[in-house]
Amino acid sequence: MSSASEIRDAVSEAYKHHNKIVVEEGISGREIEVAVLERRDGELIASRIGEIVSVDRFYSFDEKYKDSVKTKVGICDDLSDEIVCEIQEQAKAVFKVLECKGLSRVDFFYTDDGEICFNEINTMPGFTEHSMYPKLIMDKGISYSELIATLVDGAIKDF
């Protein structure tokens, strides 16, 4: 949103649905994400960096769950090794601090001035053919069947 009237209208609309709302600062930057997988022995594996590039300013439901020509999803390969390592370490740290189990997709913004901003964690990320989590894990050389076996093994261990 770029004007006070847009903010007022959005807050008014939100209050129609609930009396508690969250207003966040808009962060301009690239939307990047890391798949984190916990092996049975507790080792955390962090994937390469995935990126969502949308023509629109907002990554909508339709773009996430339907075939969209407006959005490109893939491996981000233009960041330095140092930045990639820092993002992966932050993803694993978020996973640990929140005491996650099994898997999560950790999303960040990477701003034009090089700031890494935690956005959200998805403790049950999508597994559709369009979903980033399985693509990122398979890019690490872990097959889909290995991924499922790792998750089942971890669940049995924790049970």
Give the label of every model feature segment.
Residues 147-159:
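Cysteine/selenocysteine-centered motifs that mediate thiol-based redox chemistry or coordinate metal-sulfur cofactors
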Residues 1-30, 40-41:
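Active-site nucleotide/adenylate-binding loops and adjacent lid/helix of ATP-dependent enzymes
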Residues 11-20, 65-111:
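A long amphipathic alpha-helix within ATP-dependent nucleotide-binding catalytic cores
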Residues 84, 141-148:
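Short, charged, low-complexity patches
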Residues 122-144, 156:
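Flexible, glycine-rich terminal cap/loop adjacent to redox cofactors
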